[in-house]
Amino acid sequence: MNASRATLQDLFDQAIALHQQGELARAERLYQQVLLMEPASFAPRHMLGVIRFQQGRNAEAIDLIAAALQQNPQVAAAWVNLGNVQAAAGHPEEAAASYRKALQLEPANSQVLNALAAQLLRLGQRDEALSAIDQLLAANPGDIEARNNRGNLLRDLKRYDAALADYDALLTVRPDLAETWTNRGAVLCDLGRPEEALKSLDRALGLQPGLAVALSSRGFIQRELARFDEALESLARALAIEPDYAAAHGHRGKTLSEMGHLPESFQSFLRAGELTYAARRPGPDAFAHEQQHEQEQKDWITASGEVGQGPLHIVGGARLSGRVVNLHNRDGADKAWRESDPKIVVIDNLLTDEAVAALRRYCLGSRIWHTPYSQGYLGAFPESGFAAPLLAQVAEELSVTFKDIFATHPLRYHWAFKYDSHLDGIGIHADEAAVNVNFWITPDAANLDPDGGGLVIWDKAAPLDWGFAKFNADEKAAYDFLAKNGAKTVRIPYRANRAVIFDSNLFHKTDAIDFAEGYENRRINITMLYGRRRR
């Protein structure tokens, strides 16, 4: 079809005007009319793709914009739009590639650098995301959002001093930013400076009294300082402002747990899990072992006929009418604890058969495994719904059954890990608590190495002046310390329904895992931490 250049331009200009006014259907017709007249035209095909994106038709949008870019790959805005659609469609790797194409054409485009950083974070490429933000700040040193985001990312990378420096630099020129005062408070807490952290949060609340995130962080830090009533008051204020604020429910659960109010604590944890994870499923960019677990769990639920309850599909987990912790271990375990140095006690047949079976059913059927680790295992934490009344019953009975071990230590935190069949396990670390309880609930028949699969504990404790980041995550420092002090290991093989109870400050790691294939054969361990680490 022949048409003058002026006619085509006039039609396209009309389409753009209608598009800008939100008249998508009329704009679409004009774009299509231009394409009929000039099929090789880049601009109308690109803009049709934009309309498809606005209509939520992402697959068509990707096809249209990609086709336009084949005709003219030198338009940065089109690469940006393609990246935006790919990001919305759940394709972060493709989106990052498109944003990089745009940056080749416009290297200092702050919008694109921000978008690229966001996709790199989705991909877990935090160092690369930091590089993108650094490029943005090199071009735009005064970009407030980028500076704040850089601080947040440095905190995620556990580079706390650098994060604090970014927040301080930003607050020097913009002391009115309540969010940044809040972030500063969080990183000061990470650095073990809770009193300074509270002052920073108070600055945030002075600027914005209804800032729920600051109130929630304030409650978290007050709990760390054992100021439990104040913590509950701060968290109540946060939840009055944002009743569905998951983090505040989680912090409330931790506070109530240390106060000894486990039923109420676990209700708060469950609410946090429902708010955060009810609709979450592994996406296309999830780890392969996470996707495999999702499918295996679906198949198990279908085959077993289990009907889950609530948004997290909780299977079982109710309190049992009788005891769950066996009494026959009591005197021997307490005596062993009193006499052992270092404090390490192994208890076999910890729980009743009924309790073990109920816990296995709960762990197999409930959708609570929401924290994947690249090494090949999944975590279930209280805030993701790992808060069954049966777990509270176990925690309570442990305290009253083994009084010499637990003394007055309350339950501080708990979690579970579920592993792939063949792994090295979790690396060396110590935990932020007084007493560590680690028990296992997968049948012995699943363990292909009866002499392994359990726990390795060193007979030397982490130095008391080491901070959490060092004793919990710095493996090199731990091994150097142990070698220097001639530490020896205690290797405890895996056994179903075996508990290892030990001083949480002792360095330990999961032994190498060699379990049979199959969903029900996955190694599951449950950890409960009691009390606070010595200072």
Regions flagged by a language model, labelled:
Residues M1-D10:
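TPR-adjacent "capping" and linker segments in tetratricopeptide-repeat scaffold/adaptor proteins
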Residues F12-Q20, A43-Q54, A77-A88, Q111-R122, ...:
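Conserved alpha-helical positions within TPR/SEL1-like repeat arrays
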Residues E258-A499, N505-R535:
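Fe(II)/2-oxoglutarate oxygenase catalytic core
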